[in-house]
Amino acid sequence: YLAGSLPEFPGIPGSTLPTSLSVPSFQQKRLLFNRLGQPGQVHVYRADCRAGDRIRVQMLVPVLPVGGAVVPAFAVVAHSLPYSADVHKLPFTLPAGLSAVVAPPPTELVTPVADALTSVRYYPGPTIDTKTLVGGRAYIVVWSPHNHMGKYVLQIGNRWPMRWTYWAQIPLFWWQIRGWFGLSRAAAYLALAGIVGLGALTFAALRGRKRAKRDAE
């Protein structure tokens, strides 16, 4: 489920639309790993969109070994969305000309899902799937209506990465995601030790073969 999404670990976004944190795109599949670190904190991300661009956002609630996750609300804000819902639930007053779709926190989390690549677990949360009617700047707003703190994950976008460089970085992504979840990365050390050991055996075998060839001559 997480494979195909570019993981990003941004800094703390601003809490208003003018101070929002820029994201390269809301179209390419990305995973935003972040944390609400204070009661009442609001995170706002922004990206430029064209008319007709699809904006898909899903909240993922991480299952952490020692707790510390949060189940926040989130919203998509932009000019002239096809529909607007629950705007009054936003943590700030919306400027004129903007519309929003708000996804409140789920009432319950039923069954966690395990990611096949990293073995991390998370609860799939609500999804907003909309599109922009006009070009301009769009925003994703994250906050906790109950002033809770903790880690959260946003999966945004719908376009799969096509560059080979993404797939070449899968081991790095595995390392980063496991570390953010607070899970063991011992498997990476074992794999590295195995590669080093295999390389040493191969090198020794080649040296032995060359030595035997010289002795035969």
Q: What is the meaning of each model-derived region?
A:
Residues 17-20, 29-32, 113-115:
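Short secondary-structure boundary micro-motifs
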Residues 76-103:
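Alpha-helical transmembrane helix bundles of large polytopic membrane transport and channel proteins
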Residues 94-131:
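Extended, solvent-exposed segments with strong compositional bias
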